[in-house]
């Protein structure tokens, strides 16, 4: 839970329904969870059916009076709109409603600011926040000065972010340079992993699907597990042994969410791209969530945007311990679909076997006699492949092994 120095904010959630479906209702449910994660109390909600979002006030002038009355009745201190507002919309709403105005993007950025732990995470969050604010100073400054802080004012390390345009530009420039250094370091680490010959499997999924729980259950990594949204911002990588000799690297990544702010996608590009550079995608799904299908769609769309397509996919229908009437789900976009529970251990051995099978399909089996003078080749097999057996005979060493295709020609 994020600690709040200020009195808990009482907010009303506002959305525009442009298609007549239940999407706006479902999106507001999620917005409510985000608000709760940020430390706010939701005291009301409003959905305005419109053909399109109003360019001046988001919901249209006719709905402003009704929203004013709802704020008065609920003693609300602010509103959170379910879409990203322009500076014009934010300024007009603030002038009309005389309360704190926030949007989904500001809320998510605020949660990220409170969750950032590593130096890289803090740089990425602050950069995203400043880019968002740089184009909204006119509409944002007065609104966020209300109540002395609260949602929208937090920065990484609990610092207050400056609102001066020149200072923001200078700070963005410095952060970009720092992030470039971080990205170079990340590329170096990826290169070292590639040299090791170990395959990398990236855990991806909607926020709170249980990625960290899966990693902990398999590797005892000690990664933070939290029911709150976005409990993990920093990637963690741990080695996982699939059998006596075959290892793989398992990487946990930041969770995806509907309407993920483009400022965050840009700032967290190096972190999100762990999925792009992985050898295997492990899609963790919360099978107990009624919006499972919609969440899976968001994940695959985000992977497409990141260019992380065309890889083997294992989908884990997780949290089976919370499913009242288990269903044998099948993900048609995945190579394997497995029902799992990080809590009970259900399906984890099957998952490890699926990883093993994918790696094995990309390896070549060899039975070969090496002269004693070729011991270096056996060492290469041992470091890059899976050495099943080696037997010393008068002529040399008889080897049985599985080796990656990229080193086969050197053996």
What is each stretch, according to the model?
Residues 106-128:
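Short alpha-helix plus adjacent loop in nuclease-associated cores
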Residues 105-109, 229-230, 342-344:
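Short, acidic/turn-prone active-site loops that include or flank metal/cofactor-
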Residues 186, 193-199, 218-247, 257, ...:
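Switch I (effector-binding) loop of TRAFAC-class P-loop GTPase G-domains
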Residues 1-13, 138-209, 215, 290, ...:
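C-terminal-of-GTPase-core extension/linker across diverse P-loop GTPases
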Residues 27-36, 68-73, 85-99, 245-246, ...:
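Conserved C-terminal guanine-recognition region of P-loop GTPase G domains, centered on the G4
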Residues 18-22, 53-57, 115-119, 159-160, ...:
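Flexible beta-alpha connector loops of hexameric P-loop NTPases
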């Amino acid at each position: 839970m994020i600690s709040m120095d200020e009195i808990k904010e009482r907010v009303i959630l506002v959305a525009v329904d442009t298609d007549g479906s239940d999407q706006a209702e479902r999106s507001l449910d999620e917005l409510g969870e985000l608000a709760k994660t940020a430390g706010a109390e939701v005291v009301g909600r409003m959905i305005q059916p419109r053909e399109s979002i109003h360019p001046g006030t988001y919901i249209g002038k006719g709905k402003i009076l009704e929203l004013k009355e709802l704020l008065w009745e609920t003693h609300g201190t602010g509103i959170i709109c379910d879409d990203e507002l322009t500076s014009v919309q934010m300024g007009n709403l603030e002038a009309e409603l005389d309360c704190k105005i926030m949007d989904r993007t500001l809320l998510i950025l605020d949660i990220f600011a409170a969750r950032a732990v590593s130096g890289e995470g803090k740089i990425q969050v602050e950069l995203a926040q400043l880019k968002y604010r740089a184009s909204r100073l006119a509409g944002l400054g007065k609104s966020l000065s209300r109540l002395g802080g609260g949602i929208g004012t937090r920065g990484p390390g609990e610092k207050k972010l400056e609102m001066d345009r020149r200072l923001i530009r200078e700070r963005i420039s410095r952060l970009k340079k720092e992030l470039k250094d971080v990205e170079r370091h990340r590329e170096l680490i990826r290169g070292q992993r590639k040299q090791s010959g170990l395959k990398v499997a990236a855990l991806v999924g909607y926020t709170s699907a249980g990625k960290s729980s899966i990693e902990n259950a398999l590797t005892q990594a000690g990664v933070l597990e939290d029911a709150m949204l976005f409990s993990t911002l920093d990637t963690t990588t741990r080695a996982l042994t699939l059998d006596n000799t075959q290892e793989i690297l398992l990487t946990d990544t930041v969770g995806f969410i509907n309407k993920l702010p483009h400022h965050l996608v840009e700032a967290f590009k190096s972190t999100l791209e762990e999925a792009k550079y992985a050898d295997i995608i492990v899609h963790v799904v919360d099978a107990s969530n009624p919006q499972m299908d919609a969440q899976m769609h968001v994940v695959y769309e985000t992977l497409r945007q990141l260019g992380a397509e065309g890889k083997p996919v294992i989908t884990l229908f997780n949290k089976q311990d919370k499913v009242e009437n288990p269903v044998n789900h099948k993900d048609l976009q995945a190579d394997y679909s497995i029902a799992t529970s990080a809590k009970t251990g259900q399906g984890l051995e099957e998952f490890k076997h699926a990883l093993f099978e994918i790696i094995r399909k990309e390896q070549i089996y060899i039975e070969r006699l090496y002269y004693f003078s070729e011991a270096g080749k056996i060492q290469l097999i041992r470091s890059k492949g899976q050495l099943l057996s080696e037997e010393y005979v008068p002529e040399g060493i008889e080897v049985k092994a599985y080796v990656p295709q990229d080193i086969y020609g050197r053996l």
